[in-house]
């Protein structure tokens, strides 16, 4: 059986699909993961994925492309699957993707759907209220005939050794960036946290992507080690795997840390619900006002002056959370 799993949004979303992908892989001969370009690096980390098919959907992402008939026709020609799971967040519809899969001749399609699917779905599944994204995907997979083959935790392929980047000895990682501004702690607070953690005797590595070098340099200052722009996705997985604790917002590195089994201090902006997006399957401490006015708004930019949901969190709060997790592990 050739199976396809679709998760068209971001890096972290694709990581959260990982347990469901493994469930499919346990029964299928070949698994294709259909994802967007932001999710592709995560897709290549997932055990059970044989092929990654990258496509930018006009109904997803921060800057969706225009609808082009030739683009959709080209995707239809590339899809070769007998069965498919369409994984979406609770606020997204699977039906546009299901239509493309039907046009490609996929015989069995399953998805969570609030909307009436007509003939687009063979299994219209109902998501459990308040289910975590990883659990919701596993539930759908099981309903479609792919039971859990293992403990259902997040996993990635074994990352490369990171000692050449991290140096020797224990360390804490602080990742100050986020996919959207509403989910980011202020750089000043992050820099204070680096200083406070260093004063407590921790070696602090500050991570970030190629476009975040100015941010990571500012946050690391004289007390942290700046790794901004120095790691690709597998290398970042290795850095996070070696950390005692990772401090980050509700963004991709939180899920990557969970996938390598590292405890997380989660600076969680409630623009999306923590019950669905918190670090999954690892010890974690959730910081941030979950009842702030921005709650459940899915805002990209904070709609409340001063960003109080996160900026009321202090460096001392973060340092205390790190010590709590270290005491538990």
Set out the residue ranges of the language-model regions.
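Catalytic machinery of carbohydrate-active enzymes
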Residues: 1-329
């Amino acid at each position: 059986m050739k199976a396809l799993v679709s998760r068209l949004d971001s890096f972290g979303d694709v990581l959260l699909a990982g347990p469901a992908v493994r469930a499919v892989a346990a029964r299928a001969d070949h698994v294709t993961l259909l994802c967007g370009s932001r999710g592709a690096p995560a897709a290549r980390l997932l055990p059970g994925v044989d092929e990654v098919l990258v496509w930018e959907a006009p109904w997803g992402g921060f800057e969706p492309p225009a609808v082009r008939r030739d683009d959709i026709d080209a995707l239809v020609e590339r899809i070769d699957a007998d069965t498919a799971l369409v994984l979406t967040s609770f606020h997204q519809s699977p039906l546009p993707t299901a239509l493309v899969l039907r046009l490609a001749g996929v015989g069995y399609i399953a998805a969570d759907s609030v909307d009436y699917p007509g003939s687009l779905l063979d299994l219209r599944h109902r998501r459990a209220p308040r289910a975590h994204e990883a659990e919701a995907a596993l539930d759908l997979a099981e309903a479609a005939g792919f039971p859990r083959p293992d403990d259902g935790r997040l996993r990635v392929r074994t990352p490369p050794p990171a000692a050449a980047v991290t140096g020797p000895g224990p360390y804490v990682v602080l990742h100050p960036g986020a996919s959207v501004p509403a989910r980011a702690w202020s750089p000043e607070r992050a820099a204070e946290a680096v200083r406070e953690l260093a004063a407590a005797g921790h070696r602090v590595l500050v991570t970030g992507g190629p476009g975040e070098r100015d941010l990571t340099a500012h946050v690391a200052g004289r007390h942290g080690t700046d790794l901004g722009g120095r790691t690709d996705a597998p290398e970042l997985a290795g850095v996070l795997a070696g950390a005692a604790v990772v401090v980050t917002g509700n963004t991709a590195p939180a899920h990557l840390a969970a996938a390598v089994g590292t405890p997380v201090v989660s600076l969680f902006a409630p623009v999306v619900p923590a019950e669905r997006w918190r670090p999954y399957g690892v010890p974690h401490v959730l910081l941030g006002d979950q009842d702030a006015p921005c709650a459940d708004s899915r805002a990209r930019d904070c709609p409340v002056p001063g960003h109080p949901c996160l900026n009321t969190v202090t460096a001392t709060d973060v340092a205390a959370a790190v010590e709590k997790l270290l005491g538990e592990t």
